[in-house]
């Protein structure tokens, strides 16, 4: 269970009052303290660049007559552990009566497609893995009169070849055309920090038929990990006085979004969430493109802001209570925009590191002010490129130094860039391929029922399809009792997060770890594409490496993994739920039946050329299928271990949580781009201490807490807790935003209470959280490091370089710029 910091509590910590008033048609956010912005009329005039909301359909698709394979493929997916054997996973809204003709009110039909089959509804269910669904929209215009209420574990997918349109009626009532977390009498009905496993992609949200004074929201999206928005268009009225907004997020622990286009509106987006990775968002003609109401850390990559008054407004709370913790903006452009960044930060603002900001490779075109502070212009603009500029605290490597100036940006290895920008690639949807290019694993003999051993059937279909067909994993849970080998040339896509589940004695020997899924064989060259799936284990599998990546892929066309996650325990069928693995804070006895994995993901020394996007490696801290999301104790030895000697690795929007020895470990590797990364220390630590469940194994570069923790701060137990990030003998590890969190000490949350209000304990959950080791480690550089619950923020060869008390933010502690040297 994520720390569910209620928004009112968090903003109380930073003395920022935010009123959220719900009406039948809108949510209006007002802040008691906000730096004055320019008016709508102060947009930089440029009729040549002002884009019409009808001139562009999508950032990544164009109209086509090609049938989308997902619409026409035989749908035989199942929910393996749903007691209703006829439960329907794929739902075409037209099969439920929607017309999509732009005239008929399709609200009831769409909501029925969402809810049919006893699914997990907000307010009546905290979470469920047994009621997954794809709600599919064929091409058309769907008129709705009330909000579509989103259910847990839902993928809302439109036809990418002909984006379907959602439009409100004139009397529309609700918070968002799609409401991702409905409000009730006690606030959000889902705990926003626990809303996992959902997507929205390939839709147009069109508000332009509604008067601009009607402050409708297109999408309400409080959300957590393993969620994504992709390839959507938001059309809003851009007339003077418009009150419309595209996306509203006020809570959660995200998250990823990419390839979104916004036209008009008072706010393109309003963002408030612990952390997020945002890539390739484009804004036209908004008053404010991005309005930050709060965060801990956000990373923006590839923004394009055009003809707006303000690009990013991160001034909420004013100088006495900044509620935006930190923002990193890279490879982005602001064109014909009055102010690119509006901030409340200065040398005396509070909290001291609130409003930390990093700009790297940011281009301005006819944008007069790059950064405006509380009393005026801080950084001028015009038409220029900002190589590196920031504000906050820096350690280079010593500190803290409070800075607000230009700096030398990180040196980017050429292997990671294209035309000097970092390489990116969106999740493939294969929309141009005919249905004949796909092969279903269930049609090929696999069952996916969570009981049958599907190892042989899956290996057979993968081998036969490699380099020829896209392998479609119909929804289901595919039990394997030995390693599943993904061959070179494979393209694999899941349905509603199809699960591969390792089970049995083959994976049970902690002294002889075996991969559940092996991508290629050691030293093999080639490319694999893999998306929309989960890898898990069942029962005690102490020797399981869930994903082992072996492939050598070229930097120019790397292999990719998109929306592929590991989930260890905490779900129906795992035999690692509340009944088997309850918390034991009063006992030091380890339940060996709950030692569930050796490692989540291993990138082997010979591997290279791997692009990860929106990947969450999670050992469950709670039982998703329990009515109360009750906490559990499950043990996994290691998180993500990158040992690639050649490197050329991209980690875009990744998170690793609740492993014993470490979450991220980079050892003897190089040339890694990572941003944003997020971790959580296992809640059960230090009972037992790190390394008790997971003995140190020669050859794995494991940290040895039994020696490294003696004498550290005089508190052995608090030291012997898993590293959030550990770097050993590596170079050019470039981190663009990080949230390394330690919320608990043996399930006691008071250790992470903030310094303020009075009575808070500060960061007292563990002693250290980020370690750099070895004389050969160099250019370990990081923007916007945010930690929670750790006394030391950065440790170099056992010595602390930065303490949290020197870098206090609202709830977290922040260092804007760190260079190891």
What are these regions (language model features)?
Residues 460, 464-465, 470-479, 483, ...:
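C-terminal, well-structured subdomains that either form a transmembrane helix-short loop-helix hairpin
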Residues 2-134, 147, 152, 159-210, ...:
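Extracellular "leader-to-stem" segments immediately downstream of a signal peptide or signal-anchor
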Residues 729, 736-739, 752-753, 757-761, ...:
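Long, ordered, helix-rich scaffold segments
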Residues 146, 153-154, 264-267, 274-290, ...:
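Internal alpha-helical scaffold/solenoid segments in large eukaryotic proteins
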Residues 242-243, 626-627, 631-641, 651:
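Active-site-adjacent structural elements in folded domains
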Residues 137-141, 153, 161, 475-476, ...:
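Tight coil/turn sites that cap or link beta-strands
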Residues 449-464, 477-487, 491-495:
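Glycine-rich phosphate/ribose-binding loops and adjacent secondary-structure elements
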Residues 143-145, 478-482, 487, 673, ...:
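Flexible loop/turn segments at secondary-structure boundaries
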